[in-house]
Curated annotation (Swiss-Prot):
Lineage: Bacteria, Bacillati, Cyanobacteriota, Cyanophyceae, Oscillatoriophycideae
Bias kind Basic residues: ranges: 11-45
Protein name: Large ribosomal subunit protein bL34
Region (Disordered): 1-45
Keyword terms of this UniProt record: Ribonucleoprotein, Ribosomal protein
HAMAP family: Ribosomal_bL34
Organism encoding this protein: Crocosphaera subtropica (strain ATCC 51142 / BH68)
Length: 45
C-alpha cells in the first residue's frame, strides 16, 4: 500500500494564490496592496 504524502502541487498553488491569480480579483488586489504596505519581501507565492 502506498503512503499518501501531503506534498502540494506547484501548478495548483500558483493558480490559486499566485500573483496573477491575485490580480484577477478585486479582493486579491487588496491582498497584494496590504502586503506591499506592510513591506513584505514576497507579495505572493
Amino acid at each position: 500500500m502506498t503512503q499518501r504524502t501531503l506534498g502540494g502541487t506547484n501548478r495548483k498553488q500558483k493558480r490559486t494564490s499566485g500573483f496573477r491569480a491575485r490580480m484577477r480579483k478585486s479582493n486579491g488586489r487588496k491582498v497584494i496592496q496590504a502586503r506591499r504596505k506592510k513591506g513584505r519581501h514576497r507579495l505572493s507565492v
